[in-house]
Amino acid sequence: MILVDANQVMIANLMVSLSQTEKLQEGLVRHMVLNSLLNYRSEFKKKYGELVLCYDNRHYWRRDEYPHYKGTRKRDREKSKHNWDNIFELLNKLKAEFLDHLPYKVIEVDGAEADDIIAVLCKQQGLANIRLQNNLQPPVKTLILSGDKDFIQLKRYGYVDQYNPCLKKWVEGLDPKLYIAEHILKGDRSDGIPNFLSDDSCLMEGRRQKSLAKVKIAKWSTLSPEDFCTTTELMNQYRRNQKLIDFEFIPKDISEKIIDTYESLVPANRSDLSSYFEENELNDLVSAVNYF
């Protein structure tokens, strides 16, 4: 299967459209996103199977655990020249259209991000591949379409490839075990997660994080946290990052909802796609409908 980080694909296309014209153009964004999906399917379906569009839900379980999660993004949007209320309104409209009209599984789960959906489905396929190989059958390959390096850790399951559609290059060459160990230590500033030496509020309050030297990262990434977390505070901050960053810590109830939703989804009928394109004046896509 081809797991598409749909939020990333949509926002990337939307930002390209805004670079061409300052006004948000619904028709242009719709066409660009659909054309991107057509290109992905044409290039990768033969090797990896069908597209699965994975979306963020408005409610994140990580924010329940850590209120500052992605808090810096909201602050940055408030400083942006773009009207993000209008942008999110358009993205939600297109998501609803795709659910109703595209012949793929379009999945959104309460409490989950697209990252969670992709991680859970990769793990599920990894377990299925073990059973297939035990029965002397070939494993099923999975492709992640996203530039997010968080997904490097999913290569631990085997037969998982990642392609960055924005840079048009494969994401490879990094050891998933070492990557996740370093990522937990360093945190993720873009998600509002400080390094494990720093307290919860430092990024939101604009304070500098405590210095974490590269030599320490190189050493500690090969050790158990019990070997270098010398205080309860440090251990708690390490566990904070581990829970937020390592996909193995996705809550069981979220994982079960993702699997149940995926297995129960029935894609829209491909035969109805032409009328959707015609209604939205996507005339050049009508002729390519059989390739969707």
Stretch-by-stretch model annotation:
Residues 1-143, 156-169, 246, 252-253, ...:
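Noncatalytic, basic helical substrate-engagement surface that gates or grips nucleic-acid strands
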Residues 146-151:
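Short, polar loop motifs at secondary-structure junctions
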Residues 42-55, 76, 82, 123, ...:
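Non-catalytic nucleic-acid-binding/docking modules located in mid-to-C-terminal regions
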